[in-house]
Design a protein with these regions (language model features):
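Transmembrane alpha-helical segments that form the functional core of multipass membrane systems
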Residues: 253, 260, 266-417
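Transmembrane helix interruption/hinge and helix-loop junction motifs
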Residues: 379-385, 422-430
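Aromatic/hydrophobic pocket-lining residues that form π-stacking "cages" and hydrophobic walls in ligand
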Residues: 373, 433-434
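Membrane-embedded alpha-helical signal segments
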Residues: 1-301, 315, 319, 435, ...
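Short polybasic/polar patches that bind polyanions
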Residues: 164, 205, 351, 378, ...
Length: 440
């Protein structure tokens, strides 16, 4: 038997219970009405404002209910409700008041009828949601332009649209003691590893939190190594990529109110792949993948290597290149380490400003800001032209990494390479590579 307070046949008791818990919630409406012959049966409709359209309340569900039950006696009314004589596709009887409350707060219409010991959940449009649109974070030249929205129902439908097979299972979970956020696991029953699926379920069930408002909260609470700056779950806003990974035997975790899906389990190379790799020829996709891996290495290693070479190991460079470096640094009052750190932090400010600026200006601030700051710093002899080139190449390389969370991790560890490369040379860079923190 379901835990909770059962719905009773006494409508007044049910109404008092719901009104006491909805006190102070002006957006929750409790609408009394009369059904049956001569209005002999009392009923109560409970819903959240703007989640149930007027069409449902006046012309569709309740309107049809008034017409269908106008000449029926109380017993016939109960039988009609029990048998769902209106043919509502999403009508479901609920045993307890808590189930009814959760269903109503999820955006459904809850109907209580005098003499009927169950609540009737009637599906509606739910909460207002953004329509399906392009994704700004994972742009591609070839492939679908659809992106996930904040509605888990819509996101599930976008995946089902691409995998029209009953072997694709959609499993619902709930997270958040107060938020009661709906989670969905999407997987192919014949392809997924049962051990992986069970581990994901345990990871979700093991934490207790008031509210889950985004998939990023689940990502942080379920990751195994919280010390590492690198992401342990691949994320995507593209339903075509999610469908591809489901067909590969992975599990897609969707979170209500979040357009970002988690792809489980994940390995490092997943973060370097893009959707277009599946659509392009093997030779082209392989070449582009090599470029991305090279950009990944440059993004965190280039600046530190530059400092190590010009500060400690100039003998490995040709004489002409050494002279060029020395000439570019004439008149610069700061050591190479400080000028590189200055430019790196300046680029971080430009990047952050570009993200926070309005859309019409965000694209301009990065280009114009970089040109102005770089040219002004060189003209004022604060930094050398070579340092600007190195830092710009490092920043450009980071933009080529497909996964933003992975990019942020490389941007963070880059400063460790800069400090050790500038202070200890190649020995410092080697120290980072051979060191591995051990957790006990």
């Amino acid at each position: 038997m379901t835990d909770g307070t059962p719905v009773t046949k006494n409508l007044e008791e049910n109404e008092v219970w719901f009104r006491s818990r909805c006190e102070g919630c002006s957006d929750i409406k409790l609408q009394p009405m009369r059904l049956g012959k001569d209005g002999s049966v009392s009923a109560l409709a409970i819903y959240v404002e703007n989640t149930v359209p007027n069409l449902i309340l006046e012309e569709s569900v309740l309107g049809r209910m008034f017409i269908d039950m106008a000449g029926k006696d109380p017993k016939e009314v109960y039988q009609a409700v029990e048998a769902n004589s209106l043919g509502l596709s999403e009508a479901q009887p609920l045993q307890t008041r808590e189930e009814g409350m959760n269903a109503m707060l999820a955006g459904n219409l809850l109907l209580l009828v005098e003499g009927y010991d169950k609540g009737l959940k009637i599906g509606s449009k739910g909460y207002p949601a953004r329509s399906v649109d392009n994704t700004d974070t994972e742009k591609v030249l070839r492939g679908s332009n659809e992106g996930f929205t904040e509605s888990v129902k819509t996101n599930t439908a976008l995946i089902r649209k691409r995998i029209r097979s009953t072997d694709m299972k959609v499993e619902e979970l709930t997270a958040g003691v107060r938020s009661n956020t709906r989670l969905v696991l999407v997987y192919m029953k014949e392809l997924v590893y049962p051990e992986v699926l069970e581990q994901i379920r345990r990871g979700i069930d093991q934490f207790v939190i008031d509210g889950v408002l985004d998939s990023g909260i689940i990502e942080q609470l379920t990751e195994e190594d919280w010390v590492s700056p690198f992401p342990q779950f691949q994320t995507t806003e593209r339903p075509d990529l999610a469908a591809m990974e489901v067909l590969d035997g992975r599990v897609v975790l969707l979170c209500d109110n979040s357009p970002v899906a988690l792809l489980l389990p994940s390995v490092f190379q997943d973060f370097m792949n893009v959707t277009e790799d599946r659509y392009n020829r093997f030779e082209i996709a392989s070449f582009e993948r090599v470029i991305r891996y090279a950009a990944m290495i440059f993004s965190f290693l280039l600046s530190g290597t530059y400092l190590a070479v010009i500060g400690f190991h100039t003998m490995i460079l040709p004489t002409n290149l050494i002279l060029s470096f020395a000439e570019s640094r004439q008149g610069v009052p700061f050591p190479s380490l400080l000028e590189v750190l200055f430019m790196e932090l300046a680029f971080e400010l430009i990047r952050e400003a570009g993200i926070r600026m309005p859309g019409a200006l965000s694209g301009t601030i990065g280009i114009v800001g970089g040109l102005i700051i770089g040219d002004a710093a060189v003209s004022a002899n604060l930094v050398s032209p070579m340092a600007v080139v190195i830092v710009a190449l490092s920043a450009l390389s980071s933009f080529a990494i497909p996964n933003e969370e992975c990019t942020s991790a490389f941007r963070l560890i880059k400063y460790g390479f800069i400090l050790l490369g500038g202070l200890l040379g190649m020995y410092g860079l080697s120290l980072i590579h051979i060191s591995e923190p051990t957790r006990h």
